[in-house]
Amino acid sequence: DAGAGQATSLTATLRPLFADEAERDAFATRHAAETIPTGDLATASGPLFWGLDAGSTTIKSVVMTADGAIVHRHYAGNGGDPVKAALGIVKEVREALPADAYLARCCVTGYGEGLVQAALRVDQGEIETMAHYRAAEAIAPGVTSVIDIGGQDMKCLRVRGGALDSIAVNEACS
């Protein structure tokens, strides 16, 4: 008499992401090794390179030294106005920029790329998928997949032989 007097469940569940603490710790250690050096904008000098990601709901910004250290970062909602959000970051960075440092180049990507590039006369625009792939490859050489969960969609990039092989897009994310 299976289940007589007892509630039964037919709900299927996935196995836990990690079998035990040791597996979780190994994962954390492996991923902690993938880091980008950082520095302080106040002590930076020489050419700096600025990247903006003008997304549909947020704006992200990093300023990097010529050797790739992040000296400034910003992440915030854009209130539906990527140009206004970008202007706020411009003001923030310009006020903090030391006298012996200068912005040598700026690149923008994301949903608001064209608007921000035109409004702020940004040097270059980059297709978002290429920006994500290049960043992933810089952090983890030999990367084979990149997943981008954005405000408008979600993309899964597959990489083969150092080039984008395929892109799958879910057209409704948030």
Task: Give names to the regions the model predicted.
Residues 39-67, 71, 143-160:
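Gly/Thr-rich phosphate-binding beta-strand-loop-beta motif of the actin/hexokinase/Hsp70
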Residues 118-122:
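Glycine-rich loop at the start of a catalytic domain that most often binds anionic cofactors/ligands
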Residues 1, 73-78, 124-174:
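Glycine-rich phosphate-binding loop of actin/hexokinase-like ATP-binding domains
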Residues 1-51, 55:
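Flexible inter-domain linker/hinge segments
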Residues 90-104:
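Phosphate/pyrophosphate-binding loops at sites that engage ATP/ADP/AMP, CoA/4′-phosphopantetheine
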Residues 52-84, 88-92, 167-174:
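Short glycine-rich, Thr/Ser-proximal phosphate-binding strand/loop in the N-terminal lobe
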Residues 63-64, 110-113:
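Flexible hinge/switch segments at interdomain interfaces of large molecular machines
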Residues 1-2, 85-88, 92, 115, ...:
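Alpha-helical scaffold segments in soluble metabolic enzymes
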